[in-house]
């Protein structure tokens, strides 16, 4: 058995390093089906980076830098992108993957090369679910920010648009995640701090998604 925390940490580091190397070294021609997803993932990363930079500039007197915020992964225990998107070259017969999806479908066995198409589908579905979770969070937060009399900051339609475009390109049918609502009076200071936290986390996930798409496109 592999300890869950150690596996997740190692898997994350190995995945990002491997996918970065694969993207830099690969000279393969983009496939017609994957290319739109790669294009959309690049737009996603650009929008995530620009939105975070803009937020840090506007909220310069708030704790909004990477060193100041409390990092949070809102997809934790909901999706398994890191595990599902591990390159098959790194998955050996003796490897252990403690994810809900793989343990159920492979019935506890370790993954083999015949699982290539299945693992790709699982990876892309997990990415879709990540985007869906962030989409709901951002829309909920934007609704609160638009209530702020100061109108200091709110999310523009660009980042929400590129999230939707990549989700459409992935084309998975999934249950609609209900948008959160609250009857409480919003605390705009806390909302802006949470915006910073989510934008930092989303940019990290956008980096992962872009590298995964680059790797899959070149495979």
From Swiss-Prot:
Q: List the disulfide bonds.
A: 37-110, 64-196, 85-123
Tell me which domain of life the UniProt entry assigns to the organism this sequence originates from.
Eukaryota
GO biological process terms, alphabetically, are:
immune response
**InterPro entries linked to this entry:** 4_helix_cytokine-like_core, IL-12, IL-12_alpha
| UniProt subcellular location | Secreted
Fetch the SUPFAM superfamilies from UniProt: 4-helical cytokines (SSF47266)
Glycosylated at which positions? 24, 93
Principal localisation: secreted
Quick check: keyword Secreted in the entry? yes
User: Sorted alphabetically, which keywords does the UniProt record give?
Assistant: Cytokine, Disulfide bond, Glycoprotein, Growth factor, Secreted, Signal
Protein's job: Heterodimerizes with IL12B to form the IL-12 cytokine or with EBI3/IL27B to form the IL-35 cytokine. IL-12 is primarily produced by professional antigen-presenting cells (APCs) such as B-cells and dendritic cells (DCs) as well as macrophages and granulocytes and regulates T-cell and natural killer-cell responses, induces the production of interferon-gamma (IFN-gamma), favors the differentiation of T-helper 1 (Th1) cells and is an important link between innate resistance and adaptive immunity.
This protein's assembly is summarised as: Heterodimer with IL12B; disulfide-linked. This heterodimer is known as interleukin IL-12. Heterodimer with EBI3/IL27B; not disulfide-linked. This heterodimer is known as interleukin IL-35. Interacts with NBR1; this interaction promotes IL-12 secretion.
- The name this protein carries in UniProt is Interleukin-12 subunit alpha
The gene designation is: IL12A
